[in-house]
A protein has these predicted regions:
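Low-acidity, Ser/Thr- and Arg-rich intrinsically disordered low-complexity segments
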Residues: 3-4, 11
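Canonical P-loop GTPase G-domain recognition
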Residues: 216-270
Length: 336
């Protein structure tokens, strides 16, 4: 294992990733931009902690972001996403591309950390200094993606990873958030879902750029492919030149992986040729700024108001139902 790569299989809060046991708060932007995994892992940890050193480090590296291709992978629990990702990493490495992974898990109700689960299957890549894997908890964003996920992706981008994969468990409405982060979104399904696939949200079908039927050696895989293709054709956007492919894979045997990566890379090329790659980056950055403004403004408003008599009166009136939440929010925005 390279000296810069420090990986723990299970720290006290349940994470896996590089730099987890490093408690130093010193951030070295130069090392991060050189791809130092310990320095990068440290910055991600500090950003998770909302530490001033982390924010300062992020500011120092931001101008070096916007180059990585971001691939989002989502799907129901048990669909073999982590095994699929492990083989996708290997295929990208065969093509001499550096790969970063942010694996998003639901937060543990006891520790707030990320569940290890099948992520240990990715450990085969931990001795490769061209791969960086970070498992992160959603911290209250069940099935969705927290602010620190976005920050971690940008850190890996600045570190020089050609591809950054976001893997998230596909549960709840927030699973569509992955399209806000990723240039290309791969939706993973498996045979045997039966009528459940019919209830798949239209929004999820709309965000998918590539559809994968994993565990295709099971009975019903051809039916699953046909069903997905039919649903996609019915919901096809006429002006969209990209036609999402539906591919079969057997991840545990490594079958169909090269074809999947080919399809993903074809979508990347489509985005580059159409100008949508840069447009996505602009939109994603604006969404990030908007979320920060909302967060910072709310913090500032409540910090300024919390000790005032007017704020206590407002809380009392709200509790007694003398005013409604909308009116209370309007008063806070106006400075009470």
């Amino acid at each position: 294992m390279p000296s810069s790569a420090v990986m723990t299989t299970a720290s006290t809060d349940g994470y896996i990733g590089w730099g987890e046991n490093d408690l130093d708060t010193k951030v070295d932007p130069k090392k991060i931009l050189q791809g130092d995994q310990l320095a990068g892992g440290r910055l991600i940890r500090l950003l998770e902690e909302d530490a001033p050193e982390g924010i300062a480090g992020f500011k120092a590296i931001f101008s070096h972001t916007g180059n990585a291709f971001i691939l989002g992978i989502t799907g129901p629990p048990g669909s073999g996403k982590s095994t699929l990702v492990a083989h996708i990493i290997a295929e990208f490495r065969r093509r001499n591309l550096k790969v970063g992974v942010v694996a998003v898990d639901p937060s543990s109700p006891l520790s707030g950390g990320a569940f290890l689960g099948d992520r240990l299957r990715m450990r085969q890549h931990t001795e490769d200094d061209g791969v960086f894997i970070r498992s992160m908890a959603t911290r209250g964003h069940l099935g969705g993606l927290s602010r620190t996920t976005r920050e971690a992706v940008m850190v890996l981008d600045a570190m020089g990873y050609d591809v950054v994969i976001i893997e998230t468990v596909g549960v709840g409405q927030d699973e569509v958030e992955i399209a806000d982060f990723a240039h290309t979104t791969a939706i993973v399904s498996i045979p045997g879902l039966g009528d459940d696939i019919q209830t798949m949200k239209a929004g999820l079908l709309e965000i998918g750029d590539v559809f994968v039927v994993n565990k295709a050696d099971r009975r019903g895989s051809d039916d699953e492919v046909a069903r997905l293709q039919s649903m996609l054709e019915m919901g096809m956007i006429p002006e969209n030149d990209w036609k999402p492919p539906v591919l079969n894979t057997v991840a545990i045997k490594g079958k169909g992986i090269a074809e999947l990566v080919d399809a993903v890379w074809s979508h990347r090329q489509y985005l580059m040729d159409s100008g949508q790659f840069k447009a996505h980056n602009r939109a994603q950055t604006f969404r990030f700024v908007r979320s920060l403004v909302m967060e910072m403004a709310a913090d500032k408003i409540f910090e300024n108001a919390k000790d005032s008599a007017a704020y206590q009166t407002l809380l009392g009136n709200l509790d007694k139902r003398k005013i409604d939440p909308f009116t209370a929010a309007e008063k806070l925005l106006k400075g009470l």
